[in-house]
Amino acid sequence: MAKKNAKKSKNPPATIARNKRANFDYKFEEKFEAGLSLMGWEVKSIRVGKVNLSESYVFLRDGEAYLFGCTITPLNTASTHVVCDPMRDRKLLLNRRELDKLQGLVERQGYSIVPISMYWRKNAWVKLEIGLGKGKKEHDKRDDTKEREWKIEKSRTMKHAAR
């Protein structure tokens, strides 16, 4: 019998920030993991947790992907010789194949690229999970809310019936 040689990481990726509105406003068909091109003061601020992804999105320009609208608040002890811009556009590090796929779907079929979460990979690399999806209509959001409430109600009745 063949032995599986798969290494399982003991520590799951530590989440830094989540875009909670993303799953409510969009239906994602595919998710990607992208690296971020950051400056030193940004990494220090991220370690403290001063990141906000709520109003951010990803746009494609000149064949490259950029994170726009993500706020990384600089620390008070940040470097004095570097201008700290908390709202600057940050380049995403993706493979050419992934960039081409994203470019084609966004231009032709009207998909949106939205950041879902930011997390640490191997305690050294900041990664951004981005989702490729379409915006939900109002009735889709209501259906999701009804379904979620029905699951809660069903679990309550099963819990009380078991007593």
Swiss-Prot record:
Any GO BP annotation: trans-translation
Alphabetical keyword list: Cytoplasm, RNA-binding
**Region Disordered: which residues?**
135-163
Q: Which compartments does it reside in?
A: Cytoplasm
Citing just one GO molecular function, the answer is:
RNA binding
| Start-end of Basic and acidic residues biased regions | 135-156
Q: Which Pfam families match?
A: SmpB (PF01668)
Any single GO CC term annotated in Swiss-Prot or TrEMBL for this entry: cytosol
The entry assigns this protein to a family as follows:
Belongs to the SmpB family.
What does it do? Answer: Required for rescue of stalled ribosomes mediated by trans-translation. Binds to transfer-messenger RNA (tmRNA), required for stable association of tmRNA with ribosomes. tmRNA and SmpB together mimic tRNA shape, replacing the anticodon stem-loop with SmpB. tmRNA is encoded by the ssrA gene; the 2 termini fold to resemble tRNA(Ala) and it encodes a 'tag peptide', a short internal open reading frame. During trans-translation Ala-aminoacylated tmRNA acts like a tRNA, entering the A-site of stalled ribosomes, displacing the stalled mRNA.
The protein here is known as: SsrA-binding protein
